[in-house]
Amino acid sequence: MKTCLRCRKDYPQNVAGNMLSTLRKEQNQLTSVLTGIHILRRTRLKNWLGEMLEARIIQPSISPYSSPVLLVQKKDGGWPTARGLPSLLQAHGTRQVPNSRDRGTVG
């Protein structure tokens, strides 16, 4: 069932997987609360995101259709190139999202 949630009070208090979403009504922007992350890692993540914003590696979006991107720092301390879903699908030559379970790995 599709539901259009127009303001914060319409959101359920507990969503499956403990991911709480909020709608910033004034900006029409969906955001996800960082849950399940230790407070020290959360602080580091916020600092890294702040640094990447300042360096213009990433940019904020107020589009209701934007997708979140997860960046994982490489072992050498660098950051991978973030690619959008269309270019990822084109690189794999498929219209389906690649899945780690398809390769027989645990994920």
From Swiss-Prot:
Compartments reported by the entry: Mitochondrion
SUPFAM superfamilies assigned to the protein according to its UniProt record, in alphabetical order: DNA/RNA polymerases
UniProt keyword annotations, A-Z: Mitochondrion
Gene source species: Arabidopsis thaliana
Name of the protein this chain belongs to: Uncharacterized mitochondrial protein AtMg00850
Spans through the membrane: none
Upper lineage: Eukaryota, Viridiplantae, Streptophyta, Embryophyta, Tracheophyta
Misc. remarks from the entry: A stretch of 270 kb of the mitochondrial genome is duplicated within the centromere of chromosome 2 resulting in the duplication of the gene. The expression of the duplicated gene (At2g07682) is not demonstrated.
InterPro entries linked: DNA/RNA_pol_sf
